[in-house]
A protein has these predicted regions:
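Acidic metal-phosphate-binding loop of nucleotide-sugar-dependent transferases
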Residues: 39, 66-68, 170
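Glycine-rich, basic loop-to-helix element that forms the pyrophosphate-binding segment
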Residues: 36-55
Length: 249
């Protein structure tokens, strides 16, 4: 099978077959294939983001292939973003397939938050993780959060043009923390529980030594960029997060 046939099969499988393809084509929908070397998660998405910049897109969604959601999600997010220009990035409530909440809206991590997960038994860091992962918030209200998961990042393109695209020094992991943090410096980065998506969330770096090593390298690069223990901005931002949810952390 040649590339053209593969793309046609992919489009039909993902977009719903010939009738749906025809309907979307008539509505101006386009599927664009851009061949490019593998520059990592952020680098790959930057290829699409640069195309979105050329097209003058208003919004852009970065989403993992193991995420799915209903047709009501995107209209709700767009409607909210249209009405709130202070929001540069938004993420819905994320659930496991069984309906359990995924704690993917977090404070900015310290070195202990990063490496404790790799090196320490879970029971030793359980209490700290609950604070870091904002369990006390209940995930029931909108929150302006500095670390939103890369599984679903809905951007306002004008904001993204201002803060810059993904930092490609992060091949995989930590690019979402870095991106949300940069966006958070200038815009609200919103956890939006009024809409819900589902995410399989396989935690690859906990099952693969190679992925774990990549995760550690990205963590070191992130801390080298923003600061290890001497990161006053992190402390200030995290204190603001605590204040949002009542200072109960």
């Amino acid at each position: 099978m040649d590339l053209k046939q593969e793309l046609q099969e992919f489009a039909q499988r993902v977009l719903g077959g010939e009738p749906e393809l025809k309907r979307k084509a008539e509505a101006g929908f386009r599927l664009i294939y851009i061949p490019h070397e593998n520059n990592g998660y952020g680098g790959g998405h930057n290829v699409a983001l640069k195309e979105a910049q050329k097209l003058g897109s208003v919004y852009h969604l970065v989403v993992n292939p193991d995420v799915w959601f209903g047709p009501e999600v995107m209209p709700a997010l767009i409607e909210y973003m249209d009405a709130h220009e202070e929001v540069g990035q938004i993420m819905p409530k994320v659930l496991y397939p069984n309906g359990q909440i995924q704690r993917l809206a977090k404070m900015l991590p310290t070195p202990l938050d990063f490496f404790g997960r790799f090196c320490l038994p879970e029971f030793l860091i359980r209490r700290r993780n609950k604070k870091f992962e904002l369990v006390q918030s209940g995930f029931s209200k909108k929150m302006n959060i500095p670390f939103l998961s890369g599984c679903f990042m809905f951007f306002r393109m004008s904001a993204l043009n201002e803060v810059g695209l993904f930092d490609e020094q992060f091949f995989l992991y930590a690019e979402d923390i870095d991106m949300t943090r940069r966006m958070h410096q200038k815009y609200e980065t919103l956890f939006f529980p009024s809409t819900t998506i589902y995410h399989t969330f396989t935690r690859g770096s906990r099952r693969s030594l190679r992925l774990m090593w990549i995760h550690i390298i990205s963590t070191i690069k992130y801390l080298n960029k923003w600061g290890w223990w001497n990161d006053s901005e992190r402390k200030e931002i995290n204190e603001n997060v605590k204040a949002q949810i009542g200072g109960a952390l």
